[in-house]
């Protein structure tokens, strides 16, 4: 059993996207182009890997042997909104189709490897992510505030009364779905079941970053972005 557990842990996959909206440009951090007319104002420093990065990231420089910098990416999208959509989905905006974000696609493809998950597989901290597109609302991002709070998730009823209401609702929805009301009704039922699991799951403790020791909060950064990174960990 222990060997199987270790093997499962190795095979589990996840991805973290740090979306630095409004952050510094690439020529100020990753690709300084020293000596070039298009270069940035900062000096490059050597790292633990092969690349040089900005002088203002000495701690990141120590981890560059674990990193890969992609400098060949380009786009013709000049509008920020369209560019953001492109970066989150891999597709240029098209009025005829709504593409799913990377988080929705990864969740859809890898969910069978994460059977132990009681929380949604796609989480966005602070909102702002692109939605599930044509994959449907069952793969929509679960939004958590940077302090770990989730709106409307606290149980306002005693357990017995809540489960009685959920059982009655499930009966009504099954009748609704049996009338072939479409995918939206089935997705709604799935989301309700996930919500109930969330309200009772111990895995929700992962979002309570304010319970972390002060030194851990300071290490990640005791701010919205740092807390988001800590949750992702």
What is each of the regions a protein language model found here?
Residues 1-233:
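Ligand-binding pockets and gating/stacking loops
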């Amino acid at each position: 059993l222990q060997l199987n557990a270790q093997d499962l842990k190795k095979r589990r996959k996840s991805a973290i996207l740090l979306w630095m909206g409004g952050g510094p440009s690439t020529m100020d951090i990753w690709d300084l182009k020293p000596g070039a007319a298009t270069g940035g104002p900062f000096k490059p420093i050597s790292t633990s890997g092969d690349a040089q990065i900005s002088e203002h990231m000495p701690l990141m420089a120590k981890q560059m042997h674990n990193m890969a910098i992609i400098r060949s990416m380009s786009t013709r999208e000049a509008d920020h909104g369209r560019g953001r959509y492109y970066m989150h989905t891999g597709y240029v905006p098209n009025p005829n189709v709504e593409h799913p974000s990377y988080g929705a696609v990864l969740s859809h493809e890898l969910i069978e490897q994460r059977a132990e998950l009681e929380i949604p597989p796609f989480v966005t901290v602070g909102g702002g992510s692109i939605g599930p597109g044509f994959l449907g609302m069952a793969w929509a991002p679960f939004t958590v505030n940077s302090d770990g709070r989730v709106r409307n998730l606290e149980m306002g009823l005693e357990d017995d009364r809540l489960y009685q209401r959920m059982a009655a609702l499930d009966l009504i929805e099954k009748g609704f779905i049996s009338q072939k009301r479409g995918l939206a009704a089935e997705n709604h039922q799935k989301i309700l079941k996930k919500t109930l699991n969330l309200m009772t799951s111990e895995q929700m403790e992962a979002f309570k970053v304010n319970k972390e020791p002060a030194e851990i909060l300071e290490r990640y950064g005791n701010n919205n972005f740092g807390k988001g990174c800590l949750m992702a960990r």
